[in-house]
Structures are given as structure tokens and as C-alpha cells.
């Protein structure tokens, strides 16, 4: 199923899929977009149903927008992959999230060579191949709460044979970054002290001596041993 943007399209020959209800094709001078809007069946559709036949509308990020997250969608089948990327773009539009994409990424090709059979055909081999298709969508200037809601909704509506891989980016001031760095350095120093400190045996002996010193019987034994 083809999708069309609201903008201008090059003039092409009419196709059968956009025939009118009578069965006659529209004039050759009209573009496919004009043929679609002139179709009486398309004109009777509700706006939410008619939007399925068009490309999803997107909020394009400006130069001042900051990259907040990137989303990769992977699948072994391109039809379901394209369908779900279309759904993601529409979801981002209704949540007012500026996005870039979907951009196709290089395919990952995996191949295996195995024995055809352990008995009769063990001398012959058979090749197996698996191709992973992926798309990339980048999200800009999103509130963290909105981004979390967006990802949770996609997880809820995800198809069973698709894999979603998301990366979120957080930006902070230099002062906050220095404070976090100092706190992390202190925690590492404490960890090093624990590693370089006394062993478990030494700790046990120290605690045992503390307990014995408070015991009156042990004190009497120490006094008697010192007198001798």
C-alpha cells in the first residue's frame, strides 16, 4: 500500500488502485495525490481512516533542538517493520515529539553451514542465512516523563517478532557533572580502602578481643596470668 505526503508530488500515470467508484481512471495529467483526493470512496472516509493512506505527519526538529533518545527497530521481515515504524511516527506526532527518520540501517547477514544429515547425506552440507533489517528513529527535545510514557506505550503495543532497542541521553550542567564526579570518586576511594583494609580473619579476631575484654571471667584470667 502506497502512502503520500500532503506536499507536491511529481506527475505520474494513473494506476488501477486509485480508480473511481465507477471503475474509470482519472485523467492522465493529474498526480497520484490528486487522484487519491478525487476518489469519491476516499472522500467519504473519516479523517482518522483516511490518514492511513497517507504518510504520517511529523514534527521536524529545529537547529536548537537537542537529541534526547534514539530508537532502533529490528526484525527479520520488512512489512511488519515498516508498519510498526509508521505506527511509531504517528504516536510521536500525537505526543508532539520532534523526530527524525525512520532511517534504514545496514542489514545484518548471518550464515551457517551445517551437515545435511548425520547418516545418508553426511558428506553434503547445507547453507542457512538470516537477514536482520533495522530502522533508526531519533527523538529531540522530549520531557523525560513524556519519553518514558512514549517508550512504555511502544512496549505495550509491540509486535511479537520485533525487537526495540532504545537509548536515552541526559544532559546536565557542568557543576552537577563535577559534583557527580566527586561523589563517584569518593565511593571508589572507599571501595579501595575496603579492598586494602584488614582481612576477614583480622576483623574476626579484633571483634573477639573486644567481646572478651568486657567479660569479667576473662578479666580475672588475665589478672592471674599477669601475677604469675
Curated annotation (Swiss-Prot):
InterPro entries: Ribosomal_uS10 (IPR001848), Ribosomal_uS10_dom (IPR027486), Ribosomal_uS10_dom_sf (IPR036838). GO terms for biological process: mitochondrial translation. Residues 1-17 form a transit peptide. The keyword Transmembrane helix does not apply. It holds the Pfam family Ribosomal_S10. It is found in: Mitochondrion. One of its GO terms (cellular component) is small ribosomal subunit. It comes from the Eukaryota. GO terms for molecular function: structural constituent of ribosome. Keywords: Mitochondrion, Ribonucleoprotein, Ribosomal protein, Transit peptide. Disulfide bonds: none annotated. Component of the mitochondrial small ribosomal subunit (mt-SSU). Mature yeast 74S mitochondrial ribosomes consist of a small (37S) and a large (54S) subunit. The 37S small subunit contains a 15S ribosomal RNA (15S mt-rRNA) and at least 32 different proteins. The 54S large subunit contains a 21S rRNA (21S mt-rRNA) and at least 45 different proteins. Component of the mitochondrial ribosome (mitoribosome), a dedicated translation machinery responsible for the synthesis of mitochondrial genome-encoded proteins, including at least some of the essential transmembrane subunits of the mitochondrial respiratory chain. The mitoribosomes are attached to the mitochondrial inner membrane and translation products are cotranslationally integrated into the membrane. Belongs to the universal ribosomal protein uS10 family. This is Small ribosomal subunit protein uS10m.
